[in-house]
Structures are given as C-alpha cells and as structure tokens.
Amino acid sequence: MSYSFLGGESRDNFSDQEDLFKVIEGFMGYLPNSHLSMAVNPQLNQSFAALAGTIFSSQKIDQGSMQLIALASSLSSGCKYCQAHTSHGAHQTGVNEEKINDILRYQESPHYDDSEKAVLDLAFAAGKTPNQAEQEHFDNLLEYFSKEQITDMVAVIALFGFLNRWNDTLGSHLEDVPNSFVEEKLKPLGWK
C-alpha cells in the first residue's frame, strides 16, 4: 500500500488510533491519507486532529464558509490534494457546485456577495508564499465581520498552510471520495 512518497502503512498498523480515525471519518466521510501519514507519530496526529477540531467547531463562521476559505488558501498555495478535499467539503456543507467552480472568478461571480469577496481576498493573499495579507484586507473584513470571526477565518487559513505543506511535501495520494466528487461534479463545469 502506498499513499505518499514514504509509502504507507495499513490502517491496521495503527489500531491504537482507531477511535481517532472513526471521529475523522465521521466528520469527513472518509479517512484522509494525510492522517495515516501522521499516524506514524501518534502525538502529532492527536494534536493536529485536536487543533482541526477546535477550528472547525467555531460557532462564529459557518462550515461552508470555512471550507471555501480553506479552498481559496489551497488554490493559492497550489495544493491539489487539499483543493479536492475542501471543494468536496464545501459541497458536503451545502455549497453548490457552481459556486465552488466559480471560486477563481469570485470577484466577478454573482455567486459571491461583497462580504464573501472580502474573505476570499484575504484567503487567496494569505495562501501565497510569501504571504501577501495586508492591513487593507482586515479593514475590508471589519466592515462585515467581528474580530472573533476574522480570527477564526485566519485560523482556517493557518491550518491549511500546514496541510498544504504536509500533503504536497509527502505527495499524499487522493482518496476515492474527494476524487470522485471532482471528477463527477466539478470537471464537467470546467474545473482544472
């Protein structure tokens, strides 16, 4: 079995982490190969899952917005693995395929309102290396959102900064569930 440049061990080899795997599957609908790669270091896997759980349990911004923030940041960084995960995640939270597909044209898209455009401006800027976030991004966001909401948005971007590097560096192989979503739902709409 191979799911990264390091090869890959069977899930069965990490039976001590099975409870965590089930929680992750319950949230995502499948177990990401990135968690199998992290499972080699159980403390890393537990700590990362706890951080992700804290960020995604925010009551200040909705799950669809979180997934779109993560998608924009991942598009900006170029991580195809995370792009597939977050586009699928956005769809699972109720974001329609046309809106997901239009994310690279969000400034002109009728699918995004001005507040969402301000959020995506930051996510795309912050996803770049070097980071291109500026005071203007936050001034624009403060027209629509509280500091607490913006902090949670930045947490999503930062979390995916880690995931984008982790998965691109290890060459994580995409799982069937997000791959099927991209192939069946987004590619017919022009997704590349």
Give residue ranges: language-model regions.
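Hydrophobic alpha-helical segments
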Residues: M1-K192
